[in-house]
Regions:
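N-terminal transmembrane-helix/juxtamembrane module of multi-pass inner/ER membrane proteins
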Residues: 2-147, 190-193, 197
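Hydrophobic cores of alpha-helical transmembrane segments in multi-pass inner/ER membrane proteins
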Residues: 6, 83-98, 144-156, 245-249, ...
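Structural signal for the C-terminal ends of transmembrane alpha-helices
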Residues: 22-25, 56-57, 93-103, 152-163, ...
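Membrane-embedded catalytic cores of phosphoryl/pyrophosphoryl-handling enzymes
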Residues: 31-36, 41-45, 101, 108, ...
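Alpha-helical transmembrane segments in multi-pass membrane proteins
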Residues: 51, 176-181, 297, 301-305
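Membrane-interface loops
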Residues: 61, 161-265
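Hydrophobic alpha-helical transmembrane segments of integral membrane proteins
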Residues: 120-141, 172-197, 262-285
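Membrane-embedded alpha-helical bundles of polytopic integral membrane proteins
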Residues: 135-164, 171-172
Length: 318
């Protein structure tokens, strides 16, 4: 009898003589998409579905209430909103360089790709900033380059003992997600939907609001011929929000410190979620997108990240 009591005591917490609660095993593994906790992904998915539902009925009303073409916050987000992607892609490029091995020709090609990625990001950032214009250019460029350098230094410190193959695996996962979302959004979704942006609707006579579920705009080319910019019909879905959501992949850095401290990995993940949410809000304020646009852009990248993490880390990263 005493042995039975000892067994039950080890397996459960006795709260009262009539109530007992199972004690979770310290070795129990949480359900994962690679390095992403499924319950975290599910929580974000629920919020995005709610936002899409609200946007389905009140997209135009929300944008009308928030629209401010002169908003400094909106302009800053337009210039720097893709910073999470740039940080992540830059770190991925550096990881590819660090993964090079003298005995592997393939790793050397990947290292060259890593160099090209960072050179391309510098040019992309400068050109993008000049296109936006305004007094924020200098501040935004300095902020971007300072954060990229700091992020790469921190990533190096955390992964200095990580195996080269692990560095390459994470970096290639990031690049795969970026390429996939770029093709889906820029080659398929945006041209196919041709949804007019709020800021274009406001200044273009007889150009009406188009719900997100309506695919294609038969009057698009007539308006473009009349002088409306082609970019004005790329509202659905939000590329800035999608790029900001790529920052969630920083939580998957294959560092031993992260594997030993899942809570730290979660802090990075949820911090990136909050940053992406601020970017999404800024895109609505400046009239570049509607609530449904940013919701779908975020959802696309989240789905791609879960899929890529599941493939890259099939056994999960606890």
């Amino acid at each position: 009898m005493l042995n039975l009591y000892g067994y039950l005591r080890d397996k459960a917490i006795f709260v009262s003589p009539t109530l007992q609660v199972d004690r979770p095993s310290p070795d129990r593994k949480e359900s994962m998409f690679g390095y992403i906790y499924k319950k975290d992904a599910a929580a974000i998915a629920v919020v995005l579905c709610l936002c899409l539902g609200v946007g389905s009925f009140f997209d135009y009303q929300i944008s009308s209430a928030l629209f401010n073409i002169g908003s400094m916050y909106g302009r800053f987000v337009e210039a720097a909103g893709e910073l999470p992607f740039e940080l992540t892609a830059s770190i991925a490029g550096v990881m590819l360089v660090r993964s090079a091995r003298p005995d592997s020709k393939a790793s050397k090609w990947l290292a060259a790709l890593g160099v090209l990625i960072n050179v391309g990001l510098v040019g992309y950032e400068i050109i993008g900033s000049l296109r936006v214009g305004g007094k924020l250019i200098a501040f935004q460029l300095v902020l971007t380059f300072a954060l990229v350098i700091a992020a790469n230094f921190i990533a190096y410190r955390l992964t200095r003992t990580t195996a080269p193959d692990e560095l390459a695996r994470w970096a290639l996962m990031v690049l795969a997600v970026w390429v996939a979302q770029a093709i889906i959004l820029n080659v398929i979704v945006k041209p196919l939907w041709s949804r007019p942006r709020m800021r274009v609707i406001e200044v273009t006579p007889r150009l009406n609001f188009q719900p997100w579920w309506v695919i294609g705009n038969p009057d698009k080319w007539a308006y473009i011929a009349a002088g409306v910019i082609k970019d004005g019909f790329k509202s659905f879905a939000s590329g800035h929000t999608a790029h900001a959501a790529i920052g969630l992949m920083l939580a998957g850095l294959p560092a031993a410190a992260f594997k030993e401290k899942p809570s730290r990995r979660r802090v990075i993940f949820w911090t990136a979620v909050v940053v992406a949410a601020f970017v999404a809000f800024g895109r609505i304020v400046i009239g570049a997108h509607f609530l449904s646009d940013v919701s779908c852009g975020f959802a696309l990248v989240l789905a791609l990240e879960c899929l890529a993490a599941r493939i890259a880390y099939p056994n999960g990263v606890q």
